[in-house]
Structure formats: C-alpha cells, structure tokens
Amino acid sequence: MHALSQEPTVWHGTTILTVRKGGRVVVGGDGQVSIGQTVIKSNARKVRKLGKGDVIGGFAGATADAFTLFERLESKLEQYPGQLTRAAVELAKDWRTDRYLRRLEAMMIVADKEVSLVLTGTGDVLEPEAGVMAIGSGGNYALAAARALIDTDKDAESIVRKSLDIAADICVYTNRNITIEALSAE
C-alpha cells in the first residue's frame, strides 16, 4: 500500500515509440509517472541518448530499474563499441540469468543509426517490423497510429509526435509532455 490511496503500489505507465523513416530514427516518449490512479510526475524524461550519443534509449516500467538497465547497456556498449545488437543480446543474457537483474521491471527501446531493438526482461531482443515499434501502456495505440502514418508524407519526428498524441487521447497513463531524440540513420 502507499499513502496516495488504499491500493497496492502499482506503477503504471508510459508510451515509448520508435520510427525509422527518411534516413532518420526517432524515439519519443511521454512524461507521465503514475502510482495507482494518481499522477506523481508529468515531466519525467524517459528517452535519452546513451553512450557517446550514438544510441537512443527509451524505457517503460520502474524508473530505478530502467536506469540500472541503461547503465548496464552503456557498459556493454563500451565492451562492444558500434555493435548495438551484440551489446543488447549480451545485456539480455545477463538480464535473464542474473538473480538481481531478473527482478527488474522495465522494457527498453534502443536505437542507433542502423537498428532499432526492444529489450525485455524475458531475454527477448526484437527488431521492429517496418521500422516502427512501441512499448508501454499506450504502446499499442501509438504503434497502430504510427503504422497508419508511416506511408504518408510525414517525416519520422512528425509521425512520432502525432502517434504519441493519439496514444495520450486513449491511454490514461500517457500524457502529451513528449521527449524526442533523433539520429541520422545514414
């Protein structure tokens, strides 16, 4: 239980979306953090550049867990520079087998100029279909919107922004305080 209500502590939230289009990769996420039915923070930054700025990461789930995973991923990127897929697979192996890491509750989207990936606590490392992937409570809404917009004349950033706005219209755990990071994918 927590002081804000009489329900068990359940962290809800977020929507993270990545779109690859027109030589760019864009990762965006909303800023809402909720416990139960209460919004605790509306401007959390869940998307950021990692390593030397050549990888973008976004997370859904418990914030402390996500930052632990970001740190581990940055360590793997130092071991395997320029090899995001290899670093992600090595992190996923650790995540599955390490007793401490196995308890972490988060999912991550990571992207560099060549590949976008979703990492899960079950050891999955997934590459998106058609350059679009989303995670979090509003992920399915953002994913559907982005897929509908991918073949229009909108650029990757516009697709991410519009899709996250649509997710915020539908998902009560997603807001319009959007953080965007982008890389040239050339």
Swiss-Prot record:
Reaction catalyzed: ATP-dependent cleavage of peptide bonds with broad specificity
A GO cellular component annotation in the UniProt record: HslUV protease complex
Activity regulation (record text): Allosterically activated by HslU binding.
Primary subcellular site in the record, as a coarse category: cytoplasm
Subcellular localization: Cytoplasm
GO molecular-function terms, A-Z: metal ion binding; threonine-type endopeptidase activity
Subunit note: A double ring-shaped homohexamer of HslV is capped on each side by a ring-shaped HslU homohexamer. The assembly of the HslU/HslV complex is dependent on binding of ATP.
HAMAP family: HslV
Protein name: ATP-dependent protease subunit HslV
Gene: hslV
